[in-house]
């Protein structure tokens, strides 16, 4: 009997394990899924979690390659009667996670992050897959092979005129907040694609009768043929003059002609074929190979050298050796974007990896105090506003609102003026750089017209003007960067004084970024603790906030260190006002210094935002005065009648006095 009982228990356990195994094979697909080289998506993102919630080899499933639908079993909440629910979708069907997980599964359908993810059935080569959007594009979470191999079709590039860095350029930056470097790289690749390499757009849409115009690169090719023909004629005329006039047959003139002619041909229409690309002969153009990279690279190099020499010790100073080849110019723009984030209290830039989820950081920087200051996750600070703990929040404005709620309007106004002027000047620098870069690309595009003009005495002035514009546009950003570097130095000195910053370098796959933490210096630490930036970081951490009732509603405000904060902020404001007025003439100064065109007419004015704020304030003031005048008139409805009566009485008095004067005149006349 005992043997039979043991045998029954063994059979029951075996059957249960087999059934559980048949239903619990989550993460299994009919065909193999593509795996990323670094395994990042499968391990650290929602993509891998969704894969481990789907089973395609369930006994109720269907991996038949002849069917045009996909069947999968989606995981249910733990403890349900069935481990998963079967779904069958056709190609092109879409479902949200919340539609597939209808049992309020807190890990799937009821999860605020996952419930809105849309899964789509689409083809990936010879596989029919259930795909979801990821940071690396749509990726399949479950697939099955099809019996018929689809015909290979060339993928259509929907954004054929836009550079790829417009979507992937952020991966080359080391700053968590990056937009200016992305804008520069995006514009550079787009201009290069439009002007020189040509777009991948088809000449004619299949669904329309509209034929696109020839690209800029095609037009320049025709232009180079015309210039080449003109240069041939120039050579023929020089040969005729040399044959007819012995003065042209000297060795000096012939040598000078050959050297000048070769340089003109090489930099205008190119010499070739000197290179082979993909087995095809390609002309080598000196302007595209040397001129354009030199002009576009000189601006960020000069500006970066000046800009990196400024600022607080360690703040926003990235490791240039970690930038990929061809993307080292990101260092300049990362420094700008990083400072915008730190000045405005962006939460992502400080103490981001306190839980160690991003990997092991590499510390670089000062050798001062090794303790993070201040502590950004303190216990017992219940009075801090909820907005301070939101990821990506600009906590500077939250703190300014805290001062406003405590009645310190002057601090709020000073803080707003500082932020507006600071952002306006940096926006001016970015737009000035972009305009200069566009000008360089345009000058390079029309270079086949102007470079041959150096051969003729009458047209050499046009070449000199063209060359002057190119050199000026390469140097003007460096001049403006010197002004910005001075501004950054003054701001860092006024805001952080002698504080030091420790850099943390993080690396996950191809993505690299750095954060900076404030450290007290080994000497004069009290000076750093009294700085405006240090106290603002304490407010960001939740220190110094108090909660009190305003009428019936609880509000949170700041009442500590108000006098010192006001004094420090007014010092920053003084520098802001000085640079505000100086920024009005920086564009003209850069143009005069480089003997080039003034770009202020086509750039964002450094005072534009402040001027708009002034106009808005004046408009509100005029509207208030006008409304007040209307209310005053409404209180005195008989003013108009009284004015009319008074005017009538005045006219009668004038007429009466006029009559008396006339009578006196006639009387005096009669006396005579």
Swiss-Prot record:
* Annotated TM spans: 226-246, 254-274, 410-430, 436-456, 469-489, 562-582
Annotated Basic and acidic residues bias: 628-646
Q: Which Pfam families match?
A: TrbL
Q: Which GO terms describe its biological process?
A: protein secretion by the type IV secretion system
An annotated GO cellular component? plasma membrane
* Bias (Polar residues) ranges: 363-372
Which stretches of sequence are listed as region Disordered? Answer: 363-384, 628-672
Principal subcellular localization: membrane
Which membrane topology describes this protein? Multi-pass membrane protein
Q: What does UniProt give as the signal peptide span?
A: 1-24
**Keywords assigned:** Cell membrane, Membrane, Signal, Transmembrane, Transmembrane helix
- Source domain of life: Bacteria
Quote the subcellular location field of this record: Cell membrane
Quick check: keyword Nucleotide-binding in the entry?
Answer: no
Q: Does the keyword Transmembrane apply?
A: yes
What family does this belong to? Belongs to the TrbL/VirB6 family.
Protein name as catalogued: Uncharacterized protein RP105
Q: Which organism is it from?
A: Rickettsia prowazekii (strain Madrid E)
Q: What is the lineage of its organism?
A: Bacteria, Pseudomonadati, Pseudomonadota, Alphaproteobacteria, Rickettsiales
